[in-house]
Amino acid sequence: MEVKELERDKNRVVLEYVFGAEEIAQAEDKAVRYLNQRVEIPGFRKGRIPKNVLKMKLGEEFQEYTLDFLMDLIPDTLKDRKLILSPIVTERELKDVTARVVVEVHEEPEVRIGDISKIEVEKVDEEKVLEKYVERRIEDLRESHALLEPKEGPAEAGDLVRVNMEVYNEEGKKLTSREYEYVISEDEDRPFVKDLVGKKKGDVVEIEREYEGKKYTYKLEVEEVYKRTLPEIGDELAKSVNNEFETLEQLKESLKKEGKEIYDVEMKESMREQLLEKLPEIVEIEISDRTLEILVNEAINRLKREGRYEQIVSSYESEEKFREELKERILDDIKRDRVIEVLAQEKGISVNDEELEKEAEELAPFWGISPDRAKSLVKARQDLREELRWAILKRKVLDLLLQEVKVKVVEPKGEGDDSEGKEDN
């Protein structure tokens, strides 16, 4: 077998494979064995049909089977090439003692990574975030430690109402009966709850609702109305929250520490996402238009199979505009992936089995299974293992890059305006 490079366009390479007589003879023998298990020719026992008879009776079809077996030799020649698309056969022919196959391969494109320090990400002011967090948590604690006093008057904003809700179908059959408690807010507009405003203990509210063409009656009986008194913000509140606290300041410090843990995790993830979004801006890539065209067509065909194409395209000026945007998104995704791959290799970043197990344990609650089951699942499934490996690798590379980017400290949302922030790096 001879392999010749016929054409190269950036990451797209056209290869010609020429097979000799010996390779063709071996492929023909495989075709004979394969066909003998599947075809019947009058006058010959199944499985005993000679090669010359199969070639004569099947003609071009036999040649196609022979070419199929010859092509089984091609993958080994490509194993050292990192491909982003499956090889595409553009030509193949078999003549006498020579066979020729032309294959188009699309390799991972080369990238040139620019100055990471030119990327700017935003970080919300930590001190102000924690200040607001502590304030909010203290209000939550006041709400949860409110003193309840039964009242005779009608329910109003701030009160807690306990009701027994019964649900009946159109035939009057009771389907469910359950107790609920609601705290009535200012400008209450929640379904059912808004109907409790002004009601007293013993009052009954009936509400008709229709779901999927069926009518239901909801009967809410007010069992009790409570006036809620929120505790004052002070040392006594701290003591009621936890007997380890003697003062309000101790409670605030504990809440601040709690908020800091949440802040660190969420802010790191936010900065990773910002960095990932902006990475394509500093990356130059050598990729063929043909590669992008194939990837765009594959994405569109996938959307069509899922029945989502028409709906998505309808939000664009034209199909061409959609194709252009899809092409840009795919190009940016390739840039991001290649940067992660290249930098991971350059920096010697990898993912070991212990890290995969830890990731599986952390994801187990979200998957609704035990940590041991999650680890077993990851070991058993190569696709899942690779998915987690890539997620961890990407996180590691991004965390390394975050040490080089510009960080702009900004106000928490809802505070101030769009004024300039301050740089943290």
UniProtKB/Swiss-Prot annotation:
Which keywords fit this entry according to its UniProt record?
Answer: Cell cycle, Cell division, Chaperone, Cytoplasm, Isomerase, Rotamase
- Which coarse location class applies to the principal site listed for this UniProt protein? cytoplasm
Q: What is this protein called?
A: Trigger factor
In terms of NCBIfam families, this protein maps to: tig
Q: In UniProt terms, what function does this protein have?
A: Involved in protein export. Acts as a chaperone by maintaining the newly synthesized protein in an open conformation. Functions as a peptidyl-prolyl cis-trans isomerase.
The domain section of the record reads: Consists of 3 domains; the N-terminus binds the ribosome, the middle domain has PPIase activity, while the C-terminus has intrinsic chaperone activity on its own.
Organism the protein comes from = Thermotoga maritima (strain ATCC 43589 / DSM 3109 / JCM 10099 / NBRC 100826 / MSB8)
Reaction catalysed by this enzyme: [protein]-peptidylproline (omega=180) = [protein]-peptidylproline (omega=0)
Compartment(s) where it occurs, according to its Swiss-Prot or TrEMBL record: Cytoplasm
Broad EC category: isomerase
